[in-house]
Amino acid sequence: MTYLSRSYSFYAAYHSNPVNIKIHQVCIPLLLLTALVLLHNFVITLINSKLQINVAHLVGLAYQIFYVTLDPLDGLLYSPVLYLFSYILPSKLFTIFSRSLVNRSAAVVHVICWILQFIGHGVFEKRKPALLDNLIQSLFIAPLFAFLETGPFVGYYPSVVSKIRANIKLKDVGENYPNLSEFLFPPSMVEDAVSGVVEDASQLSYCIRPLRLSDIDDGIVF
């Protein structure tokens, strides 16, 4: 399993509730944008040089290099978003509006998005946020994953998302199995078989489960 797959497995395990997923799809891009807007206030001046580097541009470039290293295709697809967030939008906002207004607005939106995400985890997901277990991974890779999860809306189905989500669905079904003594053979046998055959189990409209003794008693199996 690649580092990207392992990282998404970690992220997806904390984001399985549909409402919480939608909250993060909206809030994570806004968190990145507002953070870059605030970082746009700072510049780095090289020693013995008049050259100044905007911190927002530097952070955006670092994210871009990191994402392309993780996955060239998905990293390149996300590059216009990073360019927009780290360069175009901050520059336009500070040109059109006063610096104090932009900074205050960005800070407020940033805080609100964090609150909404904690609500998503506490109320809907009912599980602590991933950042409490792995802060660095959550902060750096979450924007790419939130972007990839919106891919199906435009007809793009990232393989890492569909495969990991399919495996999570199979595990969720396994956790809801009744008494294992009711089955003719272990549920794990079906999970392993299905995960190896079905490329995108998230598209299934039915549930695959092992045969139960009650199925035979009820005359379902002849």
Swiss-Prot record:
One of its GO terms (molecular function) is fatty acid alpha-dioxygenase activity. It catalyses: (R)-2-hydroxyhexadecanoate + O2 = pentadecanoate + CO2 + H2O. Signal peptide: none annotated. It comes from the Eukaryota. It is found in: Endoplasmic reticulum membrane. InterPro entries: Mpo1-like. The chain crosses the membrane at residues 27-47, 76-98, 105-125, 135-155. GO terms for biological process: sphingoid catabolic process. Its EC number is 1.14.18.12. Its cofactor is Fe(2+). Keywords: Dioxygenase, Endoplasmic reticulum, Iron, Membrane, Oxidoreductase, Transmembrane, Transmembrane helix. One of its GO terms (cellular component) is endoplasmic reticulum. It is a multi-pass membrane protein. Belongs to the MPO1 family. Dioxygenase that catalyzes the alpha-oxidation of 2-hydroxy fatty acids in an iron-dependent manner. Involved in metabolism of phytosphingosine and is required for proper endoplasmic reticulum stress response. This is 2-hydroxy-palmitic acid dioxygenase mpo1. It comes from Schizosaccharomyces pombe (strain 972 / ATCC 24843). The lineage of its organism: Eukaryota, Fungi, Dikarya, Ascomycota, Taphrinomycotina. The gene is mpo1.
